[in-house]
Regions:
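A glycine-rich beta-to-alpha transition motif near the start of alpha/beta enzyme domains, typified by
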Residues: 1-111, 143-267
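Surface-exposed beta-loop interaction hotspot
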Residues: 115-158
C-alpha cells in the first residue's frame, strides 16, 4: 500500500483528483482506476501534478490533454504558492501538460481559473463536417465528435453509443469525447469522454475541451474573436474565449474552480 497526497477539485463540474506525489507512468492508469472508483475518492478523472519543476508539470491518467484539469492545477498552484507570479491583481504562470507540445498559460483572477487551450496547426483548426449536425474537432491530446441533439438525440446507453460513433467514424486518439449539444436559446453540452489507457467512459458533469470544440465547430474554426458561455451538466457554465492578434490565434477556457478536499489517499 502506498500513501499519496492529493487535492480534489471541481472545475465547473468534472470532479478531478490531482496527485502530488510521484507515480511511475506505467502505474498511473491502475492507480487512477482505483482512485476514481465508488469505494475510493471518486472522480471523473485523475492527474499527476509535479509542483517542484518549472514550469509545473501535469500528466493526465492516460497521457491525454484536459483543460479542466489545467484549471484545477492552477487552483492548486495558487493555494500552494507554486509556479504562479502576481500580475495585474491576479496570478499568472505556465503549465507543462501531457497532450500539449508546449507549455500552456494559466491564470487565476477575479475568482476564476483560466487555462490556455492548444489549437491545431492545420487549416480550419481541426474542424471537419461529417454530416448534418455532426462534426469532428481534433484538438491536441483529445478529439471530439459534436452532435446536434435535435438531429442526434442523446442515447440511453451513452457509453455504447459513444463506442459505436468512435468505431463508425474511425476516430483514433488518446481520448475521444462525444459532445451532444444544443445551441439555442443558449449553448449547452452533454459530454461523454472515453480515455484509452484506463478504458474508462464517463458522462462528464463538465468538459472544458468539449466546450472549446463546440465553439470551434459552431464557427467552423473561423469565429475569432469570440466569447461564449457553455452550460455544463453540473448546471455551471464554462467560458470559452477565442482571441486573435494578427496571425496569432489563442483559445482560453475559464470559470470558478472549487477545491473541495485535500489529504492523503491509500492505494
Amino acid at each position: 500500500m502506498r500513501t499519496l497526497r492529493f487535492y480534489k477539485a471541481v472545475p465547473g463540474g468534472n470532479p478531478t483528483i490531482l496527485i502530488l506525489d510521484p507515480v511511475p507512468a506505467g502505474d498511473r492508469a491502475v492507480v487512477s482506476r482505483v482512485l476514481m472508483g465508488a469505494g475510493h475518492l471518486q472522480a471523473e478523472q485523475v492527474g499527476f501534478l509535479d509542483l517542484a519543476v518549472r514550469p509545473v508539470r501535469l500528466d493526465m491518467m492516460g497521457g491525454e490533454f484536459c483543460g479542466n484539469a489545467c484549471r484545477a492545477a492552477a487552483a492548486v498552484m495558487a493555494r500552494e504558492a507554486s509556479g504562479l507570479s502576481p500580475h495585474e491583481g491576479g496570478l499568472r504562470g505556465e503549465l507543462s501538460v501531457s497532450g500539449a507540445e508546449a507549455p500552456v498559460g494559466v491564470r487565476v483572477e477575479g475568482g476564476e481559473c483560466w487555462a490556455q487551450m492548444p489549437l491545431p496547426g492545420e487549416p480550419g483548426l481541426g474542424v471537419t463536417e461529417l454530416g448534418p449536425g455532426l462534426g469532428l474537432v481534433r484538438l491536441p491530446g483529445i478529439s471530439h465528435i459534436c452532435l446536434d441533439e435535435e438531429l442526434h438525440p442523446f442515447p440511453g446507453d451513452f457509453a455504447g453509443a459513444a463506442e459505436g460513433l468512435r468505431t463508425r467514424l474511425d476516430v483514433e486518439a488518446e481520448a475521444v469525447g462525444c459532445i451532444w449539444y444544443r445551441a439555442n436559446p443558449s449553448c449547452a453540452i452533454k459530454p461523454v469522454v472515453w480515455v484509452r489507457s484506463t478504458a474508462s467512459t464517463h458522462f462528464e458533469t463538465g468538459c472544458g475541451s468539449g466546450s472549446l470544440a463546440l465553439a470551434l465547430w459552431l464557427g467552423k474554426g473561423q469565429n475569432f474573436p469570440t466569447d461564449l458561455k457553455v452550460l455544463q451538466p453540473s448546471g455551471n457554465p464554462i467560458g470559452v474565449r477565442l482571441e486573435e492578434s494578427g496571425p496569432i490565434r489563442r483559445a482560453w477556457i475559464h470559470g470558478p474552480v472549487d477545491l473541495v478536499a485535500r489529504g492523503e489517499a491509500f492505494v
